[in-house]
Curated annotation (Swiss-Prot):
PANTHER family cross-referenced by the UniProt entry: 10 KDA HEAT SHOCK PROTEIN, CO-CHAPERONIN GROES
GO BP: chaperone cofactor-dependent protein refolding
Function of the molecule: Together with the chaperonin GroEL, plays an essential role in assisting protein folding. The GroEL-GroES system forms a nano-cage that allows encapsulation of the non-native substrate proteins and provides a physical environment optimized to promote and accelerate protein folding. GroES binds to the apical surface of the GroEL ring, thereby capping the opening of the GroEL channel.
Protein name: Co-chaperonin GroES
A Pfam entry, by short name: Cpn10
Keyword field contains Transcription regulation: no
This protein's encoding gene: groES
Family designation: Belongs to the GroES chaperonin family.
Gene Ontology molecular function, alphabetical: ATP binding; metal ion binding; protein folding chaperone; protein-folding chaperone binding; unfolded protein binding
Keyword Cytoplasm: yes
Subcellular location as annotated: Cytoplasm
Subunit (UniProt): Heptamer of 7 subunits arranged in a ring. Interacts with the chaperonin GroEL.
């Protein structure tokens, strides 16, 4: 089996899934102290990169997604599946795990 190179342009979420680029955290505090990875909290904010078509209701009608690429979102802390593509980190979430759009 040939290896497939994964990148953002080749990853299309299915159903009501959303691909979110995780926001980078500060490497040091306001006082100038560098933080080790173990001291950093898991981020809950990111930018929507790709969205699936939506999900179907009981009658089979497609319910479109409320999100679009470029939206900045707040999501549940332990939701989704983290994916590393190149040097960037992403999380693949269900739409229900997105708590709010940040404006």
């Amino acid at each position: 089996m040939a290896a497939v190179a994964l990148n953002v342009s080749t990853l299309k979420p299915l159903g009501d899934r959303v691909l979110v680029k995780i926001a980078q955290q500060d490497e040091k505090t306001a006082g100038g102290i560098f933080l080790p990875d173990t001291a950093k909290e898991k981020p809950q904010v990111g930018e929507v990169v790709a969205v699936g078509p939506g999900k179907r209701n009981d009658e089979g009608k497609l319910i479109p997604m409320e999100l679009k690429a470029g939206d900045k979102v707040l999501y549940s802390k332990y939701a989704g599946t983290e994916v590393k593509l190149g040097s960037d980190e992403y999380v693949l979430l269900a739409e229900r795990d997105i708590l709010a759009i940040v404006q």
